[in-house]
């Protein structure tokens, strides 16, 4: 970002700091987009990827309430993925270590399925969830924080895929038709040299550095955000990607 002295002097607010915050937010959204692309690329998972119909017998939003018809599709798919991960890690990674990451427009149709309605209706915690007595980060999207022993996280980051000056095209960073199941044991920051079963690692060289330059010769202020990192899905055995998740 760049502003002339006149614009900065006449602004009623700290215009340089405000745009530095905007640039940092864009960099954070960019990081989310890059990590999301990595975890939604089926080639990163080896043999640990399959369609919803192959795992559960139907699309994830077609589960029934009593096991008839398609049956408990979501449960069957999650259990099949969990078993594959558990076997592939020699029993090390269990469902309690796994996180299902879903986009809002994947969580919504799943939450409206008969299978999920029955699951919540028969849960002893259902009334507390409905009344709001128990905080839920997924409540807006209709899914509990834990489902069939798997934790759920809804990725609701939004980005504009068009360039500046074009008509905005807003969408979720996360895809609505895939469900990555990722291992997230232990703490956020790992220990160098120690074994890790965490699915995704972000290698950071320089993190979110905001730089400002007072360009006296051109009578302007210039700024930028430096975020130097790379991301990899390093533990494919501890991860699973369910594709073609929804019946659209």
Predicted regions and their residues:
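Alpha-helical scaffold segments that mediate packing/assembly in large oligomeric complexes
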Residues: 3-96, 104-122, 247-248
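A generic structural signal for ordered alpha-helices
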Residues: 1-2, 201
């Amino acid at each position: 970002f760049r502003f002339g002295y006149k614009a900065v002097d006449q602004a009623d607010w700290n215009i340089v700091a405000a745009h530095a915050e905007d640039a940092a937010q864009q960099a954070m959204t960019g990081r989310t987009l890059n990590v999301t692309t990595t975890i939604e690329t089926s080639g990163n998972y080896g043999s640990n990827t399959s369609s919803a119909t192959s795992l559960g017998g139907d699309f994830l939003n077609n589960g029934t309430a009593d096991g008839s018809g398609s049956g408990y599709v979501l449960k069957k798919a999650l259990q099949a993925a969990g078993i594959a991960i558990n076997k592939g890690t020699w029993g090390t990674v269990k469902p309690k270590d796994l996180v299902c990451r879903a986009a809002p427009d994947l969580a919504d149709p799943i939450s409206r399925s008969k299978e999920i309605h029955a699951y919540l209706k028969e849960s002893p915690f259902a009334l507390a969830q409905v009344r709001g007595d128990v905080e839920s980060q997924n409540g807006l999207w209709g899914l509990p924080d834990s489902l069939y022993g798997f934790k759920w996280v809804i990725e609701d980051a939004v980005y504009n895929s068009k360039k500046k000056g074009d008509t905005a095209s807003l969408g979720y960073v996360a895809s609505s038709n895939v469900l990555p199941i990722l291992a997230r044991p232990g703490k956020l920051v790992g220990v160098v040299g120690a074994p890790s079963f965490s699915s995704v690692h972000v290698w950071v060289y320089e993190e979110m550095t905001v730089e400002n330059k007072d360009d006296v010769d051109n009578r302007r202020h210039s700024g930028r955000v430096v975020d130097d990192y790379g991301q990899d899905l390093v533990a494919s055995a501890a991860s699973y990607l369910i594709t073609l998740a929804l019946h659209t």
